[in-house]
């Protein structure tokens, strides 16, 4: 390959120059990073792109790089701000690069200090260009096309590992991004087995961050930091892994975009430097405005609506859009295919069924053709390939024209067969989820060619010691009406271990619709381990033999993302001597732990058991004191009482006396009360100090009380009484899927917000998220409130209040995924009956918004969540306010005194102003349909006052109370103000007015 496209070849050039370029796209996204202890537990010693000496723009440089790196320094660096770096769509803060005057100063100072081999040319206005001298430039910068090709991933195969601190939804999205690259290029991502070089998805302080190209000699990180877990952002980061740099840094960029430096945030100017022509070769590819690697127009901008990069107008006078983060552009695809020398013929097939054929089929294939098809389906599925036509030149050993089918992801995978001639091959099946088909022709013989069809088959027998199983079509939604059965067998004398990375199957308490069934053995009659559905990952599973049976079933309605699980062989650690445990040995994946029977506790050696306080209590009522009561409890005690009542009973605990060491923190001595018998059951409370806890009632028919004391201060302790009472909801939640509400002698089932009760009055189904609200006030909540709202949801609320009233929305709680432009999850509020009405606000984040008031009696809300981050959502109150600006038209409209007209009298202490406005040349006509306002001779208490204009300085048309004006009222002009006042005592029914606009030439205000 004589040349490499500039963006992809650039990292080769940089490697020849620097040896260690890096990209950190925390520059692109303004997110903070919360470092936790969990993040410190990364076991892989990978190359961390966040730990660079300095950054030049998006490039990480070390001390070695600084000696030989050249830049085009075309900006006045003396103007850099000393403030912390950041910008509207993305910040530089995650790098910790808030040092005075910016990290680029460190680079320039080091270059000046080394001196040798550089020329420094002073230009006008204090600007400086730092370049290599001519005698060194030729030797120090060989052409990128042939210098360091080892930075390309061999065969386009990129092994990966996803760190343990990502959720199942995030893992699924990472795989979707990798499959996106695979679909349009010949790059392949595989789960790492024993490869030396691979990438690690991790969560680092620099936010979104990656090296450019293959580092080699071990793992390298691709950091997906806080709020960077978006499909387009991950596709962008993977572009750097493959070899892409930013589009706007190519040498010819000034022919296509204009950098508006006065709009750039102080200290961020160096992010807009461009590369030297001698460092890259663009291969004649046009500038790609649509590239997923291009900065947006307002990146590092002083303000959201100020451009920092302005695209040049095209032939039609239109400025192209830049900065998209949704999919690969045609230019991205073309350049990746050139770098990795993808064959011009063939494609990546990812559907569950498909077909392909030789070029020109059935009219003959050309000579010297090379095509590659890669079939990639869901792990856990197998591929069945069937050739329907075969007509190739036949030669000995199929030397000239042939098709090779390989059982795997690349050209070195095991060969399933090499075919030529006109004999149809047997049906071929893969052992896993990938298949490689390569076609070559080197003869001049003309034949039809070939055609083939394939199908992905879920389930089957698996004889491997480790592997992965996923639901069909994962990470996308599984398909309806599927049934897949896997039979896993590992080596003899081992068990099967199963861990889940992601789990999202349609929720139902009895898993009646979609489910995953797992059995401890080889068939459907083996002991049941569990029926699983919902969104919680099942606990790690371990079989008792070397076989495990799994069945996945989906019905024809709701489809979810499904599951991803790893299986592996496991050794039974408790055998043959019970693990050295005195009483019970509990196998865990990769290890074991000792446990004791109720009434006993582990000794200091963690294997022996000794008598303890606590125990199993099965009476309907009784007393529980601390050890030594009424004297002080001893130090270093751990007591567990397990109270079990009959089915359909609940247990209540009431403390008579309470005195433990500690305060609100409860760090030293404490008592924990849980519903359930295990240490991870639902916690009702952790108590210490001297305040007596309130009465606690269990959810079910058992309760766990655990008391702990440390080795220092001891107090008198506590004395508590427990008693049991029958509860219809305690058995199987009364058969209710969501909530069971006890009533006298019975119970009712209730569903959470966003769900509706099934016809059987027990189950809950996801509801359509469309509500029409006509009540004057009420509560609006996000779906599944107060739990986190679901992903991929769109909900609307259409609020209609009494005509003449304005809808008001007040937020009580608010927590929606944060983004400066609310581009991901958000709530939109419109001033009218639909999303076409004027918008009142687009809301996200955790700050409670100010109340929103519509100009009329209608308001439209739309809530949208994407596929990744979920938050608690929102709860808001809708109500009404009187008054407002009303448009009078020729068709009559209604105006009511208050929102509950007809149901309740008007409120006291009200002051409402309605301004009725007609079109130019028209007047306003009022027709009183109903009028009942407190009567008084001078209308001094409650009254309606009319003004012939837009405010109260206009001529007053009258003040009315009692039964109101006897006839219609007209304005002289285009506006009429109606003022309604009530005092704090008597109130009446109110009024109903119909108003319209009419042509009326006279100045008379009442009808004669």
Swiss-Prot record:
Intrachain disulfide bonds: 186-342, 206-228, 208-209, 345-371, 398-420, 458-484, 511-533, 574-585, 581-594, 596-609, 613-639, 666-688, 729-740, 736-749, 751-764, 769-795, 822-844, 882-912, 939-961
Binding site for Zn(2+): 236, 240, 246
GO terms under cellular component: extracellular space
Residues of the active site: 237
InterPro entries: BMP_1/tolloid-like (IPR015446), CUB_dom (IPR000859), EGF-like_Ca-bd_dom (IPR001881), EGF-like_dom (IPR000742), EGF-type_Asp/Asn_hydroxyl_site (IPR000152), EGF_Ca-bd_CS (IPR018097), MetalloPept_cat_dom_sf (IPR024079), Peptidase_M12A (IPR001506)
Note on how the cofactor is bound: Binds 1 zinc ion per subunit.
Obligatory cofactor(s): Zn(2+)
Coarse class of the protein's main subcellular location: secreted
One Gene Ontology term from the biological process aspect of the record: protein processing
Residues making up the propeptide: 27-143
One GO MF term attached to the UniProt entry: zinc ion binding
Domain Peptidase M12A: 144-343
One Pfam family in the UniProt entry: CUB
Location of the protein in the cell: Secreted
Highest taxon listed in the record's lineage: Eukaryota
Keywords: Calcium, Developmental protein, Differentiation, Disulfide bond, EGF-like domain, Glycoprotein, Hydrolase, Metal-binding, Metalloprotease, Protease, Repeat, Secreted, Signal, Zinc, Zymogen
Stretches assigned to the CUB domain: 345-457, 458-570, 613-725, 769-881, 882-998
Catalytic activity, EC: 3.4.24.-
Residue ranges annotated for the EGF-like domain, each copy included: 570-610, 725-765
Signal peptide: 1-26
Residues annotated as glycosylated: 122, 165, 355, 386, 621
The protein's role, per its UniProt record: Protease which processes procollagen C-propeptides, such as chordin, probiglycan and prolysyl oxidase. Required for the embryonic development. Predominant protease, which in the development, influences dorsal-ventral patterning and skeletogenesis.
Stated name of the protein: Tolloid-like protein 1
Organism whose genome encodes this protein: Gallus gallus (Chicken)
